[in-house]
A protein has these predicted regions:
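Active-site-adjacent structural elements in enzyme catalytic cores
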Residues: 1-224
Length: 224
């Protein structure tokens, strides 16, 4: 089955297979997440990523997240979660927790945030707390994603709001019913010189004290 731009399909086994083909061919798919609808593509396809930035009119300095079905997918992307982010991820994912992964030399992502001092690039990741979104990610593989709206506009909580924003400029829309709305994730990176070995870049719904407490549960120190 071929897809014309702007096609909307309910989430079924058939539409998931179609979404996987669109992503593999360098297209854009709008998907429901655990917060809002997002526009997504293959994070290894530069042309598709450029298309998201143009579509959203998003400044290039604003990085895209990479959505995963499991941290097991990090290795295939050439990413590592430095300690203690690996422990925090085990505690808070799936959910509103966005650790900053570090790229290995074999990383093939086109979404990496560059560092000015020659250190390895970095990538914010997330595992959505939604069985439906995880099913999509298992079908498509990891996705580079951003909210399905023009930059500065309201985020889409229904597939129709995403269609109204982008129309036929997106290849396929997956309709997963209304989402709950925007929830800020807590963004954390590893920093061996900072308190507890982490720097909290953005405090979201998971409070800073909850993050830090998790590092010391069961007597676990930074080396645990």
């Amino acid at each position: 089955m071929s897809v014309e731009g702007g096609t909307t399909l309910k989430v079924t086994d058939e539409s998931l297979a179609q979404a996987a083909r669109v992503i593999r061919d360098g297209g854009l798919v709008v998907i429901p997440t655990d917060t809002v609808y997002g526009v997504a593509c293959d994070p290894r396809n530069k042309a598709a990523i450029d298309r998201i930035y143009r579509l959203k009119r998003r400044p290039r300095y604003k990085a895209l997240q990479v959505l995963l079905a499991s941290t097991d997918q990090l290795d295939e992307l050439g990413l590592d979660l430095p300690s203690p982010l690996n422990r925090l991820s085990a505690a808070f994912l799936p959910g509103a927790f966005s650790p900053i992964a570090v790229a290995r030399p074999d990383c093939t992502l086109e979404t990496l945030a560059d560092t000015a001092d020659g250190r390895p690039g970095t990538q914010g990741i997330r595992i959505p707390n939604s069985a439906l979104c995880l099913a999509i990610l298992k079908a498509t593989g990891p996705l580079a994603a951003s909210s399905a709206n023009r930059s500065g506009d309201e985020s889409a909580q229904t597939v129709q709001e995403a269609v109204d924003a982008f129309g036929s400029e997106v290849d396929l829309y997956l309709d997963g019913a209304p989402t709950q709305g925007h929830v800020s994730s807590t963004v954390v990176k590893a920093d061996p010189y900072a308190r507890d070995g982490i720097e909290i870049l953005r405090e979201g719904v998971i409070a800073q004290n909850v993050i830090r407490k998790a590092l010391h549960l069961n007597g676990g120190g930074l080396g645990a």
